[in-house]
Amino acid sequence: MGVCGYLFLPWKCLVVVSLRLLFLVPTGVPVRSGDATFPKAMDNVTVRQGESATLRCTIDDRVTRVAWLNRSTILYAGNDKWSIDPRVIILVNTPTQYSIMIQNVDVYDEGPYTCSVQTDNHPKTSRVHLIVQVPPQIMNISSDITVNEISSVTLLCLAIGRPEPTVTWRHLSVKEGQGFVSEDEYLEISDIKRDQSGEYECSALNDVAAPDVRKVKITVNYPPYISKAKNTGVSVGQKGILSCEASAVPMAEFQWFKEDTRLATGLDGVRIENKGRISTLTFFNVSEKDYGNYTCVATNKLGNTNASITLYGPGAVIDGVNSASRALACLWLSGTFFAHFFIKF
């Protein structure tokens, strides 16, 4: 919009036109001077969004009239303010310097500014370009997500800023130097594995201010895997405990069987306790009939697995006494009936 669009009085428009004619500065066409040292405006001015920008113009006693323009709009002519923007103020108007300030600078203030002077002989101009920098800001980022193992995952992180920020993704839930880094708005993970679960950090950086950082959590579901199951030896009349530990997401539910019979707390003097990843089967007073093989079954919505654990008495010879046999199994669970096929290893 031209300057007359901002003014309410026709005579002011006439004065502006007169100023342009007086300075011989047609709209949008600054006059060039052969004297490169006069007037002398600053080099390009770079400020951050929200700061104040000072535009200085060096002049001398040959100057009879002086003005600051933004493109074709006069901001100040001498001490007279023509801009209706309250953020624009005059700082210095002396025989050697003519300076204005733009407060609380925003991106729309960026562009060319012209110092125009009139001497006894010729009109002269000098131009400065205002550059507005904007700190990085993440505007849109993916929400926390839960997926099944072997799925594909795409995370999005959109950021703005001036200069345009660099967006980097980093996996936080691994040791330093072991996680992968992606310099892109999109992070794509194909056939995601359980060890790729955890927090992912998006960082937007453009060196204007501290990076903007946000995090996304990926939860990877996977079927149970029995990581620890140990055979136990105990004498008749003593307390015996069989323990079974399973890793799974969601957390596994446990069941205990002896042959085809499902065990329950309070039956035959046993107690079953499930705490997190560990399930224990406790015998408070072991008898001869308690000796034998027990099966721990761990189940979640993605599948199940089991391990065979032996409770044995003194002098018994057990293969692999330090670890129970594990098995991949096909299971049918219905009431107390338990059928299975083992592939032992």
From Swiss-Prot:
It holds the Pfam family Ig_3. It is found in: Cell membrane. Keywords: Cell adhesion, Cell membrane, Disulfide bond, Glycoprotein, GPI-anchor, Immunoglobulin domain, Lipoprotein, Membrane, Repeat, Signal. Gene3D superfamilies: Immunoglobulins. InterPro entries: Ig-like_dom, Ig-like_dom_sf, Ig-like_fold, Ig_I-set, Ig_sub, Ig_sub2, IgLON_domain, Immunoglobulin_dom. Residues 323-345 form a propeptide. Disulfide bonds join C57-C115, C157-C202, C244-C296. One of its GO terms (cellular component) is postsynaptic density. It is a lipid-anchor; GPI-anchor. A lipid is attached at N322 (GPI-anchor amidated asparagine). Glycans are attached at N44, N70, N140, N285, N293, N306. Residues 39-126, 136-219, 223-310 form the Ig-like C2-type domain. GO terms for biological process: cell adhesion; negative regulation of glial cell proliferation; positive regulation of cell size; positive regulation of synapse assembly. The keyword Chloroplast does not apply. Residues 1-27 form the signal peptide. Binds opioids in the presence of acidic lipids; probably involved in cell contact. Belongs to the immunoglobulin superfamily. IgLON family. This is Opioid-binding protein/cell adhesion molecule. It comes from Rattus norvegicus (Rat). The lineage of its organism: Eukaryota, Metazoa, Chordata, Craniata, Vertebrata.
